[in-house]
Amino acid sequence: MVSRVTLCSDYQECVNSFVQLIQSSKKELWYSTFLCNLKSPLPGHGQLTMSQLLQDASDRGVQIKVLYNPATSYGNLELKEACELFPKKNCAINVCTGSGKLKGFRKLMSPHSTYTYHHQKYIMVDKEWAMVTGCDVDGDRQPWLTLNSKNYYWLELGVVFNIRQQPLVQRFFEENWKHITPPPLPLINAHTEHSLVQWLIMNASSYIHLEQQLFISNDKTTNYVAKALVDRVVRAVRNQEQHFRCFVLTNVRNPDDSPLLDFFILMLLMWSWRWMELYAQEQGITLGAFYEHIVFLHLEHEGYPIKVHSNIVIQDGLRCVRSSSNLTDRSLGTLPCDTELGLVITDAAEIQRLQQTLWNRYLLQDPPQPVTPAEFFVRAWSNQGVLRNLMTHSLPNMFSVEYISFLMTMLHNEPFFGNRKKIRWTIKKVRR
């Protein structure tokens, strides 16, 4: 579907890729960002900042179009300050805002004034190359196993691909700057992405490797990814597919969120996980049989959490989706809260290279050696490398399905579950 794909396997590779793309631009540059601290030095590039990188492009005569998330919740500068750091010439800035606002007690449950965000991260250069995900900028985002100033690590992935023969993709990036536009394949989001992820899971023959910043999916959500995972494992048990494996990597701590929000995210993860166990048993298989095929993991190194921000689904080492979407109704429900964008990748050689890189990194295996799904499964269960099995994580006894279901139903609100009505997106030009 796309040719000449490069999968970046950590934030350093992502930074190197978007620096190279921007520095190579000759005519035009389109940049969409959820979080861009224009003053933050780019890792591996001395004191170079995104502000200077864009200024250099502007000085070369490159026409720059920025689609900016004006919310400051996660580290963006105030819009007025950000505009001072964007180039003054050859640079047009549009901001994207959603109609969702928090009111009443819901506002008390969140440190943010809004629950809708422009969350698409991409770069297009000269209608020849594009990068999807991995191109946000913030000091918390650091290369693999580089501790940031807040004492946690960061896991990031990105995709660079050639779009010279992709006129629909080129047109999407141009039109999306003016108004939020449904993406053409191989770009995906919302219902298309949700359906594809389910298809990848249900049609996997060897393994599913899933990494998600947030994992909120159960019988009360309108995304059915967790159900698809259980259904596929149940089928493996019934058909005696002893080789089939599912790897689910997510976060038990979200140190870039407030303590209150972090607590509720953990409860929702536990609710989803425990619901999957109950659903599997309802389908007639034991938990012992269930866990012969699936493992739930988080990442930790020397006592510090590794923030999973990679949001990728890999099927059998042959196909994958890398997306800005989280596994929640906010991104993949029937009424999404956030704008998202992902890419379908079918370059098997590149996917397998990435898969082996990730498995070797998680096992702290140096020099790298070939790792099979069966071997990774066994070593993941025994907490090798930076892998931590969720089954061995110390969690309060109160995290039962019944308790969390009752509590979250009582507190049912948009920041945690998703939206109850369709979001209207507005794009406005910033006048400077």
Report the location of each language-model feature.
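Short acidic, glycine-rich surface-loop motifs adjacent to enzyme active sites
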Residues: 31-38, 210-215
